[in-house]
Amino acid sequence: MDGTAFFFTIFVWFLLISVTGYSIYVGFGPTSSALRDPFEEHED
């Protein structure tokens, strides 16, 4: 396997895992209590 393609693949996987982990942390972590819920703002 070409060295450049291998490191590019590792970089893309690391980027994908990092973004996914950060999204889960923001959505369910300690800072999630500060997020607003637009469904609770409307009373239909």
UniProtKB/Swiss-Prot annotation:
A GO cellular component annotation in the UniProt record: chloroplast thylakoid membrane
Family matches, as InterPro entries: PSII_PsbN
Top-level taxon of the source organism: Eukaryota
Main location: plastid
One Pfam short name: PsbN
Membrane association type: Single-pass membrane protein
Segments traversing the membrane: 6-26
Compartments, record wording: Plastid, Chloroplast thylakoid membrane
Annotated S-S bridges: none
Keyword Ligase in annotation: no
UniProt entry keywords in alphabetical sequence: Chloroplast, Membrane, Plastid, Thylakoid, Transmembrane, Transmembrane helix
GO BP terms, alphabetized: photosynthesis
Family affiliation: Belongs to the PsbN family.
The protein's role, per its UniProt record: May play a role in photosystem I and II biogenesis.
Protein's UniProt name: Protein PsbN
Taxonomic source organism: Bigelowiella natans (Pedinomonas minutissima)
Lineage: Eukaryota, Sar, Rhizaria, Cercozoa, Chlorarachniophyceae
